Design a protein with these regions (language model features):
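Solvent-exposed soluble domains appended to multi-pass membrane proteins
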Residues: 1-238
Length: 238
């Protein structure tokens, strides 16, 4: 049942109610483990959502309202999911599919790309906080490691909980490709243009970028190019 929708689709609560019903039906009819991918849309412009759920009016059309409603609906989902027989044997991964904006003072403003990520499985995975530079591409290898899966990896990502984990991140816009390793951020742009920035944290911005003269680290530039070329070749293979 759809109780609220906008140009993007149904509100998060309606989507989660459908998930609860669908997973319940799946669990009732088969003993085979299942995988579900859920995409919610309320945290998108025009940021409209059902009235009376949060303190910010549903017609205010504020990003903060979209975020608050997203949080509210997610909490409601976990509350309902915790009552289901499949909850105790399920691992939940929550993250954003992209950042809110890529506009800033530099080609790729790193502070805009900081998104949340959560792996949640009470009773299966002990709570902890990972204070490392981790990319979306690291989520699957990390999850597979937590599940104890044995597999041949073709991932670019790594297990973020491994002692051998190397902190790095891939970020991009429609025009530029970025590669962060250590405190050096390499940006590849059209027409063979490249720039490197050094992270110089400030009180306001832990990822403040300072443009370097020339290319101080040819090694990191070569690595960025090779990684993106390898990815492109793999994705366009016959």
């Amino acid at each position: 049942e759809v109780t609220f929708a906008n140009i993007w689709g149904v509100c998060d609560e309606d989507a989660y109610d459908k998930v609860i019903r669908s997973l319940g039906e799946r669990a009732d009819t088969t003993a085979v483990p299942f995988f579900a991918h859920v995409m919610t849309v309320s945290n998108h412009r025009p940021y409209t959502y059902p009235a009376g759920r949060i303190p910010i009016p549903n017609d205010a059309k504020l990003r903060s309202g979209g975020v608050m409603y997203t949080d509210y609906a997610l909490g409601r989902f976990f509350e309902e999911a915790s009552r289901q027989p499949w909850f105790a044997n399920t691992v939940f991964v929550v993250t954003a599919d992209h950042c809110a904006s890529s506009a800033g003072k530099t080609e790729i403003p790193l502070e805009k790309y900081h998104i949340p990520a959560l792996i949640f499985a009470p009773g299966l995975i002990a709570p902890r906080q990972v204070d490392k530079v981790v990319s979306q591409i690291d989520l699957m290898p990390t999850l597979f490691s937590l599940l104890g899966m044995d597999y041949d990896s073709h991932f670019f990502g790594q297990d973020a909980l491994s002692d051998d984990f190397r902190e790095r991140a891939f970020v991009a816009t429609y025009q530029d490709l970025g590669y962060l390793e250590g405190d050096v951020f390499t940006v590849l742009s059209p027409v063979n243009r490249a720039e490197q920035y050094r992270i110089s944290p400030t009180e306001e911005d832990r990822y403040n970028l300072v443009l370097e003269e020339g290319i101080p680290s040819q090694e990191l530039l070569d690595r960025a190019i090779s990684l993106y070329q390898t990815s492109s070749a793999w994705n366009t293979r016959p």
